[in-house]
Amino acid sequence: MRKLFVWAVFCMVASLARAQEQRSVVQLVTDSGVVKIVLYNETPLHRDNFLKLVRDGFYDGVLFHRVIFGFMIQTGDSLSKHAEPGKIYGDGRYESYKIPAEIHYPEIVHRRWSVAAAREGDENNPQRESSMCQFYIVYGKRFNDDMLDEEQERLDRETGGTVKMTPEVREIYQKYGGTPHLDGQYTVFGEVVEGMDVVDKIQRVETDDNARPVGDIRILKATIVE
């Protein structure tokens, strides 16, 4: 009887642990394919805000308004739902609130396929608060040791030496690639778990001089699937 009781307690604890580790998944149906994003529980403010916007249909119809080959693809500006040809989007002036930064470096970094919040620059936003709605998906590139040394020098200049790459972080960028120069400065709140080929396809499209795709690429529908 005692063994059964102990086993029942063990099962209950294991079940609670799984529930705590369960992560929300959002599906983005784009006109280039389907992308699934898992949201990190380590960034609850960004997670909950993103889920609310998805439930409200905020992202349905928005453009990928900024695409840079070998770097990232950016979306989330609701003004782009009725985009004018050639117009620049993403300045964020209409946004009604910001999200406090939830930067967890070096545990969470800008490895390839990461999802991070866009924001205003440090000059106007020293607290590095995030945009209420705009986000980007990291593509980046792979690095060797010499390249990572250069990236560390860049980080030192931009952060006053406060962001240092650990051996584990360097290994991530050597193995998977990404954008290390953004680490410690932007909130990474999720990652792509399906549809990497779609992200790769989008980051290769032709763009104008302002990094807007020549042919509009949209999120047709965003839904919570888990």
Descriptions of predicted regions:
Residues W7-A19:
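Hydrophobic h-region of N-terminal signal peptides that target proteins for export
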Residues M1-L4:
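Positively charged n-region of N-terminal signal peptides that target proteins for export
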